[in-house]
Amino acid sequence: KCISIRLVVPHSVGSATDVIMRAYAETINRRGSGPLIKVINVTKKSVKWQRIWSKTDGCNLFATTQSLVADHLANKRKPIWSWLKPVAMLSRTPLLVVARGGLKDATLANVVEKALQDPNSVGIGEARSPLERMMLMSLEDMTGARFRIMTYDTGRESYSALLAGKLDIGIISITAGRRRVEHKELQALAVSSEARSSVLPAVPTLKEEGIRGTFSIDRGIMASKETPDELAAEIAGWFEKASEVPELADRLAEYGTIVVYKGPDEYTRYFENLTADWQEMIQRAAGKQTRRRAS
């Protein structure tokens, strides 16, 4: 039995993943249904990170997104999700498709139509992130359009270029875009979820704009591969009960995030299906004309 469980977040304090994991941990700790859960922020490159995953006692959990799939598909030398044990999916955070403030006739339908006519006519930024690349590829796959992709080292650089009017459209977090949209610095085109966001309720969904499909950042927790199934199921149960607490849903909604719970088996199938779907999407993209990338 674990006296306490460390929930390792490979991002800084205050990041979206950190906020979501702390909300869950605090909800579980208040209920007192199991060992105390402590959120630990550790970078992937640190020696401490390696020590954590050398432990097989089930007392360490790892917060993750679909980046485990995206990173491996981009570089087969990267760890694959199946090296770990899926415990539970916890949340889904839709994204916001936006246009620069000065773009005329800025609707998603108009932007897509323009890109379909001329793939070099609509510029979009992309950071050097495999997960961000998959989100952009999802938008292209759903619309059939190809955009003129400008590559940046970081998401912050790409976002700054969008605000400066150097790009036509972008895919950003709903919370990051809210203030910019309200101040007319950006124009909201669509949210990438099935339902409208409570953060920006006036913004239509992709479906409302005539586009079938959704994409989002999905967060969950993993354990070491050797963690006993019984222990993984017990831990998942704590998070499942927390997911049913209305106050948690309200708290996450402030960040444009929806509570979505999947247990160990369902979360495993989720990763299997996501890997297959993204591999097929990559093959479809490769079968079409090479996208122009400018750095």
Description of each model-found segment:
Residues 2-3, 142, 229-295:
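An extracytoplasmic/periplasmic, membrane-proximal ligand-sensing/linker region
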Residues 69-76, 90-104, 137-142, 218-221:
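Periplasmic solute-binding protein
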Residues 92, 106, 177-244, 273-276, ...:
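C-terminal lobe and pocket-closing loops
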Residues 62-68, 91, 126, 154-155, ...:
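Beta->alpha turn/N-cap motifs
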Residues 1-83, 120-121, 128, 132, ...:
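N-terminal (or domain-start) structured segment
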Residues 59-61, 78-96, 123-125, 208-212:
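A structural signal for short loop-to-beta-strand junctions that line the ligand-binding cleft
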Residues 99-120, 203, 209:
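Flexible hinge/capping segments at coil-to-helix
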